[in-house]
Amino acid sequence: MNNIIAQQIADQGGVEAWLHAQQHKSLLRFLTCGSVDDGKSTLIGRLLHDTRQIYEDQLSSLHNDSKRHGTQGEKLDLALLVDGLQAEREQGITIDVAYRYFSTEKRKFIIADTPGHEQYTRNMATGASTCDLAILLIDARKGVLDQTRRHSFISTLLGIKHLVVAINKMDLVDYSQATFEQIKQDYLDFATQLPGNLDIRFVPLSALEGENVAAPSGHMGWYSGPTLLDVLETVEVQRVVEQQPMRFPVQYVNRPNLDFRGYAGTLASGSVQVGQRVKVLPSGVESSIARIVTFDGDLQQAAAGEAITLVLKDEIDISRGDLLVDASAELTPVRAATVDVVWMAEQPLAPGQSFDVKIAGKKTRARVKGIQHQVEINSLTQHSIAELPLNAIGLVDIVFDEPMVLDSYQQNPVTGGMIFIDRLSNVTVGAGMIRQPLAEETAAGSTDFSAFELELNALVRRHFPHWNARDLLGGK
């Protein structure tokens, strides 16, 4: 146990009181990203060090590792606290997404340290998918680079609305205000191309020297704003799911005995209360909430993010992957959607390919109808492409094998997010953010099957009726 935790336990009157206080602190998930060697891992190490989250044995080990692998001379190489893979330490870069946890008196934090290299875009997208805020590091000597633009675009694409632009290594430019202001203006000019209403803040700092990270800098009197830690402790994160209508994807049908039948899952958005009329999709059958069951007892009301089991008044057919919504919700199941795809496989994504896809617990099959364009994520320009290569991002048309209930990703990341799974290897090969579900008539009117596909479909339906294959032309 480190000294600061021991002191907090003593101040709060024991372990139980301390644990209770920790449990009720708000949680902020954020990621650090930027160009290679901008100091992402060093910044996280500095946050852990200055908030006294490092144990004595870790600090001793860090001194030894700094002498062996360090790049900071006689100083502690704080990046070694989070660069855990041997390849990372030897190359001085981050490869994997490294998660770290720390807390202050005001808040708990989960940090995702993401790779800066372009070939690890898929790792960065994975880290960003669960975060509320992104820290974009910029080397004060280099300014806004292509990778800064790329990480900004990916962060906003994945729904992050709060961006903190940390202009690092200010010690190497003599803490110049003019340098800071120029980089700030350059980034604001670029940010006009990013989607959504963004909360962008700028902090000049030196992660290596600890300037403006957890304590104010003594060398930047011209900066009167908060430190980076102050920003993290006080930012008010508006989670989209709390303001959206009720969405409850069923993950598991809980039937421990003949007297109980409940539907377990995590409430994706909105709220639900006992007595509320709900509708099951895609069937459209309605019922009302009889009980909201949790491990700690029944609730009268539940909010987004809570893991609950819903018991309905009526016995109706519900299975894993079905979606419970408010009875007044007007949602129509669709068979097609346009999707922003981050491709994660060595083999390119191409029209005509089929994959298993998973959306909010529901697994089905989907076919790539076409690729509208690829986004050049360094310049945010769009261009036509026949195939989507590894680490590329593009807008793709998808056709599902069965009706799906979808939201756009910006409205609801749970019911608007999806993964592509290779049907042979069962490996996740892509991540998708639904931009727009397509109405049935739009999808049907734009479908263009080859003669071979139509002939094969007819043969399968004639000779293998037990497969229940759908008529591609829309017949019975």
From Swiss-Prot:
Residues 34-41 are annotated as: G1. It catalyses: sulfate + ATP + H(+) = adenosine 5'-phosphosulfate + diphosphate. GO terms for molecular function: ATP binding; GTP binding; GTPase activity; sulfate adenylyltransferase (ATP) activity. Residues 113-116 are annotated as: G3. InterPro entries: CysN_GTP-bd, CysN_II, CysN_NoDQ_III, G_TR_CS, GTP-eEF1A_C, P-loop_NTPase, Small_GTP-bd, SO4_adenylTrfase_lsu. The keyword Amino-acid biosynthesis does not apply. Residues 92-96 are annotated as: G2. SUPFAM superfamilies: EF-Tu/eEF-1alpha/eIF2-gamma C-terminal domain, P-loop containing nucleoside triphosphate hydrolases, Translation proteins. Residues 168-171 are annotated as: G4. It comes from the Bacteria. GTP binds at residues 34-41, 113-117, 168-171. Keywords: ATP-binding, GTP-binding, Nucleotide-binding, Nucleotidyltransferase, Transferase. GO terms for biological process: hydrogen sulfide biosynthetic process; sulfate assimilation. Residues 206-208 are annotated as: G5. HAMAP family: Sulf_adenylyltr_sub1. Belongs to the TRAFAC class translation factor GTPase superfamily. Classic translation factor GTPase family. CysN/NodQ subfamily. NCBIfam families: CysN, PRK05124.1, small_GTP. With CysD forms the ATP sulfurylase (ATPS) that catalyzes the adenylation of sulfate producing adenosine 5'-phosphosulfate (APS) and diphosphate, the first enzymatic step in sulfur assimilation pathway. APS synthesis involves the formation of a high-energy phosphoric-sulfuric acid anhydride bond driven by GTP hydrolysis by CysN coupled to ATP hydrolysis by CysD. Heterodimer composed of CysD, the smaller subunit, and CysN. This is Sulfate adenylyltransferase subunit 1. It comes from Erwinia tasmaniensis (strain DSM 17950 / CFBP 7177 / CIP 109463 / NCPPB 4357 / Et1/99).
